[in-house]
Amino acid sequence: MFAFDNKAQENEQQDEDPGTRTKEEEKNVTSIYKNINFLKKIFDQSKKEGIEYLIVLGKNFADYYRKGVKGAENLAIHGGDG
């Protein structure tokens, strides 16, 4: 369901100390996990109903997901019937 840029993640993992997140970053991490759980529920429901959903995550989503620094509020689903 998700594609990640592993090389970019490896480079950033060397630079980041996970114990130094600010309260704002922690809030974004929580938002990201809530959004991922929401997307997973939609995906699971679609399998039961036989409806296919296309969920598009921005090219930098892997960075947002791992760092929790930015992008959490921009993660959204835009539905349509066509």
Swiss-Prot record:
Region of interest (Disordered), ranges:
1-27
The superkingdom listed in its UniProt entry is: Viruses
Q: What spans are recorded as compositionally biased (Basic and acidic residues)?
A: 18-27
The name on file for this protein is: Uncharacterized protein ORF82
| Species this chain originates from | Acidianus two-tailed virus (ATV)
